[in-house]
Amino acid sequence: MIDRYKHQQLRIGSVSPQQISTWANKILPNGEIVGEVTKPYTFHYKTNKPEKDGLFCERIFGPIKSGICACGNYRVIGNEKEDPKFCEQCGVEFVDSRIRRYQMGYIKLACPVTHVWYLKRLPSYIANLLDKPLKELEGLVYCDFSFARPIAKKPTFLRLRGSFEYEIQSWKYSIPLFFTTQGFDTFRNREISTGAGAIREQLADLDLRIIIDSSLVEWKELGEDGPTGNEWEDRKVGRRKDFLVRRMELAKHFIRTNIEPEWMVLCLLPVLPPELRPIIQIDGGKLMSSDINELYRRVIYRNNTLTDLLTTSRSTPGELVMCQEKLVQEAVDTLLDNGIRGQPMRDGHNKVYKSFSDVIEGKEGRFRETLLGKRVDYSGRSVIVVGPSLSLHRCGLPREIAIELFQTFVIRGLIRQHLASNIGVAKSKIREKEPIVWEILQEVMQGHPVLLNRAPTLHRLGIQAFQPVLVEGRAICLHPLVRKGFNADFDGDQMAVHVPLSLEAQAEARLLMFSHMNLLSPAIGDPISVPTQDMLIGLYVLTSGNRRGICVNRYNPCNRRNYQNERIYDNNYKYTKKKEPFFCNSYDAIGAYRQKRINLDSPLWLRWRLDQRVISAKEAPLEVHYESLGTYYEIYGQYLIVRSIKKEILYIYIRTTVGHISLYREIEEAIQGFCQACSYGP
């Protein structure tokens, strides 16, 4: 449907019988109204043409071939001069055959039938509104018992029954005998209500606002009593309060959506368009039919039988009528949801019939597979792998995927730069993978974001925008910090990539959907781009060092390990080692590591800036080394101070490792980049 803002939307809910009739009925040019399916037949076994008023009737659902009626006559579609617009012999309109994808029909039920979703699904909406046990309502729906209508003011049979003792044997046996008499239909229609009709009458008598007020009053009364000390009673009260809350919310929803409660009981059963439940001819002349067709046939057979019992056979026993109503109810239940809270119906090969619920629900259902998960142009799919060298807002796109997604843009670039005379020549260059193709592809990708999506998309961070870069291989590279937003793991998960085409979509991707703009959880506001798993392990290894400290003693087990340029004797715990190297800056330290002169966790002394003090006023030096020129070294736990003869601080060295230096430089560059970006701001 399309709302007033011209937004296409799909809304699921209950509708009135009048609305179903409006959807299905259509008036032919001769004034005849068609739409009701009355016969359980599909195709004639000799002519292979749809049966009239059957499940594939061309009068109801439209012609199988565009502009050709059931008689074989042909008319040009849309030609205003050709009259009439339908065949006078078979009554089929000369319209496009695509009408069979959306034209509905309906079955007029001989008795009301409850919708199984509202009755047997938990929580049961019908049971909540009527405030009655589900088991009692099921017994009423399936004609296991009845209730009396309080409509007659004069003494009636049921009113007189209260003046007798039901325990008397003669009275107990007289009631069943009366139910089998010929006058039972009149008595039943006047005073007894059973089946789904009884549910419909009770739902029609409900006042939703009174339900809300009474439930609220009862909820407040239960809350005023407080705990009784009896655990069983307190649980019972708690369950009752929860039920009242659900009942009020349900009533408010019915009021807000303008849905009447009695619409949960069906009088007209919609029939799906035939193209959504096709019959296909396979090899050998055999026909393959959708299971829904067989379930519809079952409903029509039983409904027609009930209609005959109510109209033609006046002497039909009441018990037989009630039994047939139960069969109609069960047939509709099987059509809507086969096997809900019971044994499913099976065919001759012991295969469970696929009902309407099975068609639309689940991963392979109509919504998730066809509507939500349908394949679209300018999209691809591949496995994701970690790309630690990528920026947070970038993703690595394989060349094979990128050239397919941006092929039209590359073709336009080749033609504009006069590198190809037409589309065919441009495609030929792309197939041959000429170097100029990759240059143009990179130019195109620089100004065009892509969208990455991981199913299931449970919140808005399931789709984020990235700036693509070309990578080798066939996997999509992703920054590890965005993993949590997608709820993805790098263990074989797949993600889909989409190219936004319109300017509005590209602007939305850049302003709202880029990954570096979605650092907080939209639900609770906590940071969502945080290091996890292997990133934490990597940071630990990077900054762990050898953890020996400057004070080497024989009780530290780390001192027993062998290091380069170091020997430890276990006999007398004496050790000799080369002096730890001194570096003037971090570049020299990292250069020494790359030349394999030191290890990642080897301790070293790094000159520190004097303006960044690391001195603790209360800390005393562990050792003091004096030199011949008067300068001396004060050695502390994790730093070293070089002082002049006048006790002025000349240099400060900190004891660190290459791993610490690398992490510090990354953090420093990130902070400087952030400050630089902020300086250009308003």
Swiss-Prot record:
Gene3D superfamilies in the cross-refs: 1.10.40.90, 2.40.40.20, RNA polymerase II, clamp domain (4.10.860.120), RNA polymerase Rpb1, domain 3 (1.10.274.100)
Record GO terms (molecular function): DNA binding; DNA-directed RNA polymerase activity; magnesium ion binding; zinc ion binding
Major subcellular location class: plastid
Entries under InterPro entries matching the protein: DNA-dir_RpoC_beta_prime, RNA_pol_asu, RNA_pol_N, RNA_pol_Rpb1_1, RNA_pol_Rpb1_3_sf, RNA_pol_Rpb1_clamp_domain, RNApol_RpoC1
Bound cofactor: record note: Binds 1 Mg(2+) ion per subunit. Binds 1 Zn(2+) ion per subunit.
Binding, Mg(2+): D489, D491, D493
Catalytic activity reported: RNA(n) + a ribonucleoside 5'-triphosphate = RNA(n+1) + diphosphate
BP-aspect Gene Ontology terms: DNA-templated transcription
GO cellular component assignments: chloroplast; DNA-directed RNA polymerase complex; mitochondrion
Cofactor: Mg(2+); Zn(2+)
Assigned keywords, A-Z: Chloroplast, DNA-directed RNA polymerase, Magnesium, Metal-binding, Nucleotidyltransferase, Plastid, Transcription, Transferase, Zinc
E.C. number: 2.7.7.6
Compartment list: Plastid, Chloroplast
Binding residues for Zn(2+): C69, C71, C87, C90
Family membership: Belongs to the RNA polymerase beta' chain family. RpoC1 subfamily.
Quaternary structure note: In plastids the minimal PEP RNA polymerase catalytic core is composed of four subunits: alpha, beta, beta', and beta''. When a (nuclear-encoded) sigma factor is associated with the core the holoenzyme is formed, which can initiate transcription.
HAMAP family named among the record's database cross-references: RNApol_bact_RpoC1
Function according to Swiss-Prot or TrEMBL: DNA-dependent RNA polymerase catalyzes the transcription of DNA into RNA using the four ribonucleoside triphosphates as substrates.
This protein's name: DNA-directed RNA polymerase subunit beta'
Taxonomic source organism: Panax ginseng
Gene from which the chain derives: rpoC1
